[in-house]
């Protein structure tokens, strides 16, 4: 334990010595004199435009109904197909007297 502490203290002191030497080698920098900067004229502020209200969202158009003529125009093949699919109605017999 003692060896570790001694080793650490030696390294720290060595680092400090090196740091001091390096600091002494580099002379401290002098602050550079500030150059006179030409002042900019402040830009004129333009008046803010009033906020434009967004137009209300348009309602979705209702689906257009097909004209009656289009509904009636059913092809013959479609009618036949529908007739095959439809359940056949039982023919009612007239009651016997």
Curated annotation (Swiss-Prot):
Keywords: Chromosome, DNA-binding, Nucleus. This is Histone H1.C2. GO terms for molecular function: DNA binding; structural constituent of chromatin. Residues 31-97 have a biased composition (Basic residues). The keyword Nucleotide-binding does not apply. GO terms for cellular component: nucleosome; nucleus. Its main location: nucleus. It is found in: Nucleus; Chromosome. InterPro entries: H1/H5. The keyword Nucleus applies. GO terms for biological process: nucleosome assembly. Residues 24-97 are annotated as: Disordered. It comes from Trypanosoma cruzi.
